[in-house]
Amino acid sequence: MKTYLITGCAGFIGSNFVHYMLKKYPEILLVNLDKLTYAGNLENLKDVEGDPRHVFVQGDICDKELVEGLFQKYDFDYVINFAAESHVDRSIKNPEIFVQSNVMGTVNLLQRAKEAWYDADAKTWKEGKKYLQVSTDEVYGALGADGYFMETTPLCPHSPYSSSKASADMFVMAFHDTYGMPVNITRCSNNYGPYQFPEKLIPLMINNVKHHKQLPIYGDGMQIRDWLYVEDHCKAIDMVANGGKIGEVYNVGGHNERPNIFIVKTIINQLHDRLQDEGISEDLIKHVADRLGHDRRYGIDPTKIKNDLGWYPETPFEKGIVLTIDWYLNHEEWMDHVTSGDYQNYYQDMYKNK
């Protein structure tokens, strides 16, 4: 039976990955580590409570003793690192937190994995071990009107968030190049789907539209992102963990490029028709000052993972956005819970005064 350390398991992509893996593999043990910051919510894992294949540990990936103890107790076969501060706006206001979690936390995981997996006397790595870093296409910077990011595209991050993720990626490859650690990195485009914290575009807009709140759009709204349904991403991570060539980077994209303003108008139209609510219209859109250093376009070329592992995105945007809206409409209690308290202060600070 394979044993995984899943960090950031209570966040958006991490919790979806936990659900995906438990559904797919009857014989598996997932030790799920999460600090439970604002975006980490145990309600995301409510459906797997009591499953003996799922062990939850609250803690920080920067905690050396905690992580070392987990390696000693469980002898992990895989580490899948989702744990990260991930919102660009928050990184602009407080970059130090992003360095601590995204860079120092990654280095701690790498060091503890090296201590557990490397036999210094024999100068060999234990068989069947792998560290997988879940990263982002934002480490590449921005694109023009055409072209795509490839795995060979130089890293050129523009925000404190993407800089911290690029730094973490470089440490992962340094541990491979220096020590021979078995690693992979996946770099994905913009994810969407269930359990996403409503600071991100799609759940933010769904929630605001439902409550007739203004819809804050940065600049002209023509920033283009490649949208990837989260379950497709989970499938890709599983395939890279179990079949990816050691030391390789794999780009994971959805072939669903859309401008932000298109996304917002799609959500407006969907909810207007479903809820039969005349208060839902494009009049709710409010253009606000653009984000500092806002990248204009991202686009992923996933040819490598398609050719090497046979992965492809199964969910077109037109289907994925319907599934996503359905989920949020059917989980109003979840949304009410995560948007209480500190979220209101954050929202006021981010959008109301612009």
Question: Which functions belong to the PLM regions below?
Answer:
Residues 41-44, 94, 145, 197-201, ...:
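Residues at alpha-helix caps and immediate loop-helix transition turns in enzyme cores, especially N-
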Residues 36, 190-193, 223-224, 291-292:
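Short histidine/acidic/glycine/proline-rich micro-motifs that form metal-
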Residues 41, 50, 145, 194-198, ...:
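Residue-level signature of the cytosolic catalytic core of signaling kinases
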Residues 90, 141, 193-197, 225, ...:
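Secondary-structure boundary/capping motif
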Residues 1-191, 231, 241, 323, ...:
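N-terminal Rossmann-like NAD(P)+-binding domain of SDR-like oxidoreductases, especially those catalyzing
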Residues 3-4, 17, 24, 30, ...:
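C-terminal substrate-binding subdomain of Rossmann-fold SDR/epimerase-dehydratase oxidoreductases
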Residues 48, 147, 198-206, 267:
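A glycine/serine/threonine-rich, flexible loop-to-helix segment
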Residues 8, 162-163, 196, 227, ...:
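Residue-level marker of alpha-helix boundaries and capping positions
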